């Protein structure tokens, strides 16, 4: 394929002026070869991953330097730890967590993801052990991330696991709870943490890629000054095509260097705290004075559809969440809007209906209690189950009044403690069991 001089200059501008980068190159690797009822054997087998992780780290660095494309993070996704804890005790889970964390540190891997369990309809021994060690595992590590898939359109929503999850994150520091999520309909090939894990049906090892690029789309809209909604859609679609093509190039080259298959490109637009790298900035460039104002959901829906259509044209290997992320703390403009009140939890719930982010990187006040957080999570995951969407919740419990701001630094940004509704929901949150799958399940046959 030949490139015009204009296209080359455009890519140069994207990389150097509009913060286009690869958010993550993720090695997803099967670790079930290490299964055993002997903790010592599991640890020793997991340590044999060292040579693969070394090669992965070197390959990403080489590809990044060769093409002049910044890769923000290197990540590794492993098989869910639930499977290991079916035959091992809770203490073994902590030791496995520490071993994976040490491997990540040794090879300069930013995150190792997979301290995870599936509890859609109920909990096996392994799943419950993961949940009950969740806080200790993440507090004992720096790079480990974890996910609880608490629901699916096929099986329903497990209320008990939501309550256990909330108990665990209330024990965590903000830095640890930022590495924990609860989700419904989780995909098996996500390159994004904390949801990343080596899912069922995947090959032995595979490379998945997450792109970034909100600044590219915002810049394209501002330059084009579209007059109609069709023109606006087209501008976003074309920019998305170019972003995705770059992501696939990097992913395929890393996979080629490692001698393993390339998996998928996650089309999600991931913001960062840097100025000019904001999903909220795109919505405001589309004509909403402050994101959260009426019309914001429509603007986000247009953005999502155009990004997916442009991305699908650029690659036949689409995977992960493939949506727009609206993590409040990781988006500088979202932080401002949350502080001034134009963004609240109901705004985020409405936006979740048209994207796959859910409620992400938002602070909640421990002083408002667990019951309200349980209800909030149930609201988001119920939408996922009912609409057959991927949605998750990553909230940061903080011992402060609503309105407080805690700076976690780096990509995690500033966490705004947003006010939960002052309505008593303790009776509802005291229910046990699971919510049966909806009528949507019947449409699947």
Regions found by a protein language model. Give the residues of each.
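Anaerobic metallocofactor- and corrinoid-dependent redox/one-carbon enzyme cores
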Residues: 1-445
């Amino acid at each position: 394929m030949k490139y015009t001089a204009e296209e080359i200059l455009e890519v140069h501008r994207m990389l150097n002026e509009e913060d286009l980068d690869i958010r993550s190159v993720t090695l997803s690797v099967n670790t079930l070869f290490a299964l055993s009822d002997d903790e010592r054997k599991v640890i020793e087998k997991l340590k044999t991953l060292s040579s693969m992780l070394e090669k992965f780290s070197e390959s990403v660095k080489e590809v990044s330097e060769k093409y002049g494309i910044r890769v923000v993070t290197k990540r590794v996704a492993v098989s869910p730890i639930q499977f290991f804890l079916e035959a091992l005790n809770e203490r073994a889970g902590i030791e496995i967590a520490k071993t994976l964390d040490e491997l990540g540190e040794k090879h300069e891997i930013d995150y190792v993801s997979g301290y995870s369990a599936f509890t859609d309809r109920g909990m096996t021994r392994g799943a419950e052990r993961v949940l009950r060690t969740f806080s200790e595992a993440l507090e004992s590590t720096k790079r480990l991330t974890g996910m609880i898939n608490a629901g699916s359109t096929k099986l329903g929503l497990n209320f008990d696991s939501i309550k256990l999850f909330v108990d665990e994150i209330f024990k965590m520091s903000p830095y640890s709870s930022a590495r924990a999520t609860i989700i419904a309909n989780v995909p098996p090939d996500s390159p994004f943490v904390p949801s990343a894990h080596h899912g069922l049906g995947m090959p032995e090892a595979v490379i998945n890629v997450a792109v970034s690029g909100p600044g590219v789309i915002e810049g394209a809209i501002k330059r084009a000054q579209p007059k109609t909604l069709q023109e606006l859609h087209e501008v976003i679609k074309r920019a998305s095509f170019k972003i995705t093509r770059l992501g696939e190039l990097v992913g395929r080259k890393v996979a080629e260097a490692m001698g393993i298959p390339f998996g998928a490109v996650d089309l999600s637009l991931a913001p960062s705290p840097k100025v000019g790298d904001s999903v909220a900035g795109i919505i405001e460039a589309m004509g909403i004075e402050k994101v959260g104002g009426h019309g914001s959901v429509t603007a986000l829906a247009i953005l999502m559809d155009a990004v997916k259509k442009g991305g699908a044209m650029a690659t036949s290997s689409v995977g992960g969440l493939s949506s727009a992320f609206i993590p409040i703390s990781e988006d500088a403009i979202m932080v401002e809007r949350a502080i001034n009140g134009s963004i609240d939890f109901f705004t985020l719930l409405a936006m979740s209906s048209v994207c796959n982010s859910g409620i992400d990187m938002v602070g909640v006040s421990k002083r408002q209690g667990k019951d309200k957080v349980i209800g909030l999570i149930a609201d988001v995951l119920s939408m996922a189950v009912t609409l057959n969407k991927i949605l998750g919740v990553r909230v940061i419990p903080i011992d402060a009044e609503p309105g407080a701001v805690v700076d976690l630094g780096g990509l995690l940004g500033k966490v705004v403690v947003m006010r939960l509704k002052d309505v008593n929901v303790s009776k509802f949150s005291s229910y046990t069991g699971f919510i049966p799958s909806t009528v949507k399940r019947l449409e699947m046959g």
